[in-house]
Amino acid sequence: MEKDFKTEDPLCPADISPVMGRAIRLARLLETSRMVFLPITGEGRGEGLFILDNLDAITSEELEAAIASLPQWRREKALRFKFEQGRKECAFSYLLLCQALREVYRITEQPSFSYGEHGKPELSFNSQLSPLTSQLFFNISHCKQAIACVVSDQPVGVDVERIGRYNESLARHVLNDSEFALVSQSPDPQISFTRFWTQKEAIVKLTGRGIDDDLPNLLLKYNNVSLHTEDHLDKGYILTVANYRG
C-alpha cells in the first residue's frame, strides 16, 4: 500500500513518497535528495528508528540544498567540516531527526539541542509544544555508510558502525573472555565483533555516561537493557538500538 506524508511547514520541507512495507524511501528532499527510512515501533511505546544509507548517492548540489535548509547554528556547524563526507553526516543527521520527529510525533518545528549533566544532547524547542515533548528522547549515530536516528518516549541509544577489518588486539581490549571466544570461532569474526561493538556503544550512548573502565563486561553490567541489532551486510554496516526493559 502506497502512502504519502506531506507538510506545508517551510521548516521541514521534505516530502516522503512512497512507503512500501517497512521501508520508506524519501524521494525528494528540497526537490532532489534521497533517503531510506526503516521504522520500528516498540511495544506500547512511541518509538521509531530511521536509517539513511545512500550517502554516496547524494550529489554536491543536493548537499548544498540540504545545508541551506538547516537552521543557522546547524548550517554553521556543517560548513565547519573541511570534507564533504563530514558535511553530509552533519546536515543529513539533523534532517533525519526532523523527519523522525515529524513521522512519529507530528512535530514540524526544527529542534535545537540542550545538553545534560554528562554532555548527552536533549531536544529543545522554541514554541510551547505539548508537555509530551519534554519527555522525548533521541539519539543519532553515523559512519561512512549510514546515518541512524532513533526517537522515543524513553531514554534510548543507537550506534552504527562500518564492518571493517578484524583487529584482534582491539577485540581483546573491549570483549570479555566469553565474547572473545565467540568472535574468534565465528566464520566471520569482523561481523561478529562489529555486532558486539555496536551493542556496547549503544549502551554507552543510552546511559550518557561515556565509556567506563569495564567495557569488556558492559553487557553483563547492564542486563536490564534491551538490544535491537540489525545487520545490513549488503551495505557494509551493522547497527544496534538500546533501551531499558519494561
Positions of the model-derived regions?
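Extracytoplasmic copper-binding redox domains, predominantly the cupredoxin/blue-copper superfamily
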Residues: 6
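Core catalytic alpha/beta fold that binds nucleotide/phospho-ligands
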Residues: 2, 16-40, 48-246
